[in-house]
């Protein structure tokens, strides 16, 4: 008997999956606070990764190291990538006003609230979050 591989496609990678944000102290879901992100198998995420690989190859062809590791630059790049794969949110407010979903606001949230960024990174890194439930 064979198994249909189509059943194992992370079909939500390009559609986006919803992360329920968890309180950093109580570890309980914050009701209504969600962030919708694309998965690591999405076309956009794969294009971002290919761009990084191409940049490393270009550096090597110029006789430079593939990566000059700089923690600050890596952190900025990580946030840049997350901004590009974040496609929506609900329930985020700042100073008692709803926080509009814009790339600038996404960048601010991921920069100022590292615990949110870490939850998003972990969620994106888990392919299981991007499969539709069967049946």
Give the residues covered by each predicted segment.
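Short, solvent-exposed coil/turn linker segments
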Residues: 1-7, 70, 93, 97
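Short, charged/polar N-terminal "headpieces" of proteins
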Residues: 1-61, 129-135
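Short, structured surface segments that line ligand/substrate-binding pockets
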Residues: 67, 71-75
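Conserved catalytic/acceptor-binding region of the Class I
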Residues: 64
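Mid-chain, well-packed structural core segment of small domains
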Residues: 74-91
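C-terminal charged interaction modules
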Residues: 90-135
């Amino acid at each position: 008997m064979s198994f249909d591989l189509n059943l194992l496609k992370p079909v939500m990678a390009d559609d986006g999956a919803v992360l329920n944000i968890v309180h950093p102290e109580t570890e309980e879901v914050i009701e209504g606070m969600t962030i919708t992100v694309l998965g690591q198998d999405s076309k956009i995420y794969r294009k971002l990764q290919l761009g990084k690989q191409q940049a490393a190859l270009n550096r090597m062809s110029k006789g430079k190291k593939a990566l000059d590791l700089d923690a600050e630059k890596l952190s900025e790049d990580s946030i840049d990538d997350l901004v590009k794969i974040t496609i929506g949110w609900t329930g985020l407010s700042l100073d008692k006003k709803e926080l509009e979903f814009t790339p600038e606001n996404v960048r601010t949230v991921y920069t100022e609230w590292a615990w949110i960024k870490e939850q998003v990174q972990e969620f994106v890194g888990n392919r299981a979050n991007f499969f539709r439930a069967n049946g």
